[in-house]
């Protein structure tokens, strides 16, 4: 069923050029519950941040497709709930494309060092390269606390995404 819903969302996104849904991309789909009370949660984003009108547009189009497909509607149940939303602050980055919208922002990153041990890093995302010859990578400028009378010494940290265990956007005060 999840694959069928995924196909449904993919079709809606493919047809969204020039519409209110343009620019949005799929992050994740979760189907919860059983029988006629299922809840479908669709997580979306856009490179410049998804807007409410984009979520509403996609929600309407996906609902129309599900309700127009008798087989899928039977699987989902007629009383299904559909929620289309964006990842909230503090939610981990799931797919590489999400890094693009967080350039310049503070991230809390856990990555595996050369020994495979987890390392925590908090810093500003400086650069994203999804098409590097060695694999997708990010560049983080670590945040360092200033010591009185001294300039902090910082060097950018380059991480390939296969090293990243978890990355969470942080609020800046």
Swiss-Prot record:
UniProt entry keywords in alphabetical sequence: Cytoplasm, Ribosome biogenesis
InterPro entries: Ribosome_maturation_RimP, RimP_N, RimP_N_sf
GO biological processes: ribosomal small subunit biogenesis
GO annotations of cellular component type: cytoplasm
Subcellular locations according to the entry: Cytoplasm
Name of the protein this chain belongs to: Ribosome maturation factor RimP
Source organism of this protein record: Pelodictyon phaeoclathratiforme (strain DSM 5477 / BU-1)
Main location class: cytoplasm
Listed Pfam families: RimP_N (PF02576)
Lineage: superkingdom: Bacteria
Its biological purpose: Required for maturation of 30S ribosomal subunits.
Phylogenetic classification of the source organism: Bacteria, Pseudomonadati, Chlorobiota, Chlorobiia, Chlorobiales
Protein family: Belongs to the RimP family.
């Amino acid at each position: 069923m999840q694959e069928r819903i995924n196909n449904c969302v993919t079709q809606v996104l493919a047809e969204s050029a020039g519409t209110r849904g343009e620019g949005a991309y799929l992050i994740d789909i979760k189907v919860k519950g059983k029988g006629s009370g299922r809840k479908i949660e669709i997580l979306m984003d856009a490179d410049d941040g998804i807007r409410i009108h984009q979520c509403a547009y996609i929600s309407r189009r996906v609902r129309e497709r599900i309700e127009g497909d008798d087989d899928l509607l039977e699987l989902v149940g007629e009383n299904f709930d559909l929620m289309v939303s964006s990842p909230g602050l503090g939610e981990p980055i799931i797919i590489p494309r999400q890094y693009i919208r967080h350039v310049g922002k503070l991230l809390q990153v856990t990555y595996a060092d050369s020994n495979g041990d987890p390392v925590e890093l908090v810093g500003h995302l400086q650069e994203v390269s999804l098409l590097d010859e060695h694999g997708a990578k990010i560049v983080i400028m670590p945040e360092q606390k200033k010591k009185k009378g001294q300039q902090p010494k910082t060097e950018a940290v380059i991480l390939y995404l296969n090293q990243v265990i978890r990355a969470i956007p942080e609020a800046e005060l």
